[in-house]
Every structure is written in structure tokens, then in C-alpha cells.
Regions:
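PLP-dependent amino-acid enzyme catalytic core
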Residues: 1-309
């Protein structure tokens, strides 16, 4: 296949059955790690920038500034590299060093904020930076309607093509809320039996009505309910702890040969918790958000297995 640039390769990601982790159930995972920037956020990065171009919100001299926990930043950095935009990314210092290096490799500038302030601190800092200069634009992934819209128009359509027989359960994490919103809204029109469950860290259960807090599951659990998240389409939320998320991230690699990130492991742990309520013949879908290669430096996640002869 030939493409004019790398951005044309975003989307059309494969779906794989998890036959070893869940041998007695019909559980599938959509591999968003196969996007060129390595995550599901490539979709919204391109969508937000192209929507802003179409609406005249940005030009070649615009400085783009965005708060991000990592994957959206990587996607924006990749898109900005191709399109030639100046990009500054603001992220909590608790995010992995691999993410920072990836964004820097694409040419983005990085500003770190205190870990205890979470994403709220990164958002506030991005606003502060934008107010200091002229001709700046903040994509605002947590509020930008292009976020769920791209999932309605692409991700959900791909799933419909792959699952003509239907999907019964969507169990997936909430970062911005864009993919669970866009996918669920479209799938429920075709498959009214679909039940959608959000996955969130047990240390920051805001969708479940709890208080925000620091946690170790990078990529989900922003500490607030994002504006783009349609909570009306959710049947509920499943809380997952660090150890469960780490364990399933490790098992996914060792048993299924899929190297995913921590949030992917969290979604698998959530599925394991819900299995008792799921009929064996039901179709369950989750999302692999990114690649585990972004988390080598996370203590206790992936350990070396060196033996001496």
C-alpha cells in the first residue's frame, strides 16, 4: 500500500481475540497501538488540527499548546511535524520519560507540571502559557467536539464492519472520554443491547462519584469528568487498582504476545472483574490504547529476565 504521508495511515486498526486470557469467553481487543504514532490518540490529534484548519482557527504561524498525559501529545507532535506547526506540550511530571522523549523526538517542546496537581495542573499551565503570547491555540482535547466525532466517523465504523454479528459489551478506559463516547453512541444505534462500562482507577473514581486522587494508571483517570464524555451512554464504571492493571499488562504480553500499556491492562482487569455477569456467548470488546514500549521506566511493570549460565 502506498500513502502520500504518514498521517494517511492512521486508523483501520486490527481486532484480535484474546483466546488465552479469556478462553471461555468471546473477548476482543482493537489494537490502536498499530497507528503510526503508536496510540489511539493519533486519531484525535489529526482530527482536532484539521478541524481547526478548516474553521480558520490556526495558520502556519500559530503556536499550538496542549496539556496532555502523553499519548495525545505524541499524536499532536507527529501531526505537527508533518504539517510544520510549532508545538508546546504541558504534562504532569509523573508521566513516563519515554513519552517525553517521544514528543521531543518529533520536535515538540515539553513543559512539566507538579505531579500532585495532575491533569488539572497541566491544563492551568497551558492556559497560562497561551495567554502570554499572540496567535496561540489550545486544542483542548477534553472539550473539543472533534474528539468524539472522529471516533463516531472512523473507530466506530471500523468496529461495525468487523462485528456485523453485534457487540454486547464495551469495557474501556476513560482518558478524555472521546473514544468511549463516540464508539458507544454509534454502536448502540446498531446494537441496542450493548452495555458500555468505563474503566477508572480505584484511587481516582470520579465517574463513580468518588474523589480524585493521584494514581499509577497512566492515560486514564484525569481526576474530573471531561466535557466530551457522554455519561448517559454508560451503564456504570469498573474500578481497577495498580497491581491488577500491572498484572494484566504483563499477562497480555506473555500470554497473547501483545505489548500494551498500563491502561490497556486496566481494561483487561476490568473485564476479568465483570466476567461473572457476562454470558459466555456474549461478544466483549476493549481497546488497546498504546504500546508498552512507552513504559519501560515504570518501576515494577516490566522487569528484565536475565539468567546466568
Amino acid at each position: 500500500m502506498k500513502f502520500n504521508n504518514v498521517l494517511e495511515t492512521i486508523g483501520k486498526t486490527p481486532v484480535v481475540r484474546l483466546s488465552k486470557l479469556f478462553p471461555n469467553h468471546n473477548v476482543w481487543i482493537k489494537l490502536e497501538r498499530t497507528n503510526p504514532g503508536g496510540s489511539v490518540k493519533d486519531r484525535i490529534a489529526l482530527a482536532m488540527i484539521e478541524a481547526a484548519e478548516k474553521e480558520g482557527k490556526i495558520n502556519k504561524d500559530t503556536k499550538i499548546i496542549e496539556p496532555t498525559s502523553g499519548n495525545t501529545g505524541v499524536g499532536l507532535a507527529m501531526v505537527s511535524a508533518v504539517k510544520g506547526y510549532d508545538l508546546t506540550l504541558v504534562m504532569p511530571e509523573s508521566m513516563s520519560v519515554e513519552r517525553r522523549k517521544l514528543m521531543s523526538a518529533y520536535g515538540a517542546k515539553i513543559v512539566l507540571t507538579p505531579r500532585e496537581l495532575g491533569m488539572k495542573g497541566a491544563i492551568a499551565k497551558a492556559q497560562e502559557l497561551a495567554e502570554k503570547e499572540n496567535n496561540t491555540w489550545i486544542p483542548q482535547q477534553f472539550e473539543n467536539t472533534a474528539n468524539p466525532e472522529i471516533h463516531r466517523n472512523t473507530t466506530a465504523q471500523e468496529i461495525l464492519n468487523d462485528f456485523s454479528e453485534g457487540v454486547d459489551f464495551l469495557i474501556t478506559g476513560v482518558g478524555t472520554g472521546g473514544h468511549i463516547t463516540g464508539i458507544s453512541e454509534i454502536l448502540k444505534q446498531r446494537f441496542p443491547q450493548l452495555k458500555a462500562f468505563a474503566v477508572e482507577p480505584e484511587q481516582s473514581p470520579v465517574i463513580s462519584g468518588g474523589a480524585p486522587g493521584p494514581h499509577a494508571i497512566q492515560g486514564i483517570g484525569a481526576g474530573f469528568i471531561p466535557a466530551v464524555l457522554n455519561t448517559d451512554i454508560l451503564e456504570g464504571a469498573v474500578l481497577v487498582g495498580k497491581d491488577e492493571a500491572f498484572s494484566f499488562t504483563q499477562r497480555l504480553a506473555k500470554e497473547e504476545g501483545i505489548l500494551g500499556g498500563i491502561s490497556t491492562g486496566a481494561s483487561l482487569a476490568a473485564i476479568a472483574k465483570k466476567l461473572g455477569e457476562i454470558p459466555q456467548n456474549a461478544t466483549v470488546l476493549t481497546i488497546n490504547y498504546d504500546t508498552g514500549e512507552r513504559y519501560w521506566s515504570v518501576d515494577g511493570l516490566f522487569e528484565e529476565n536475565i539468567i546466568s549460565e
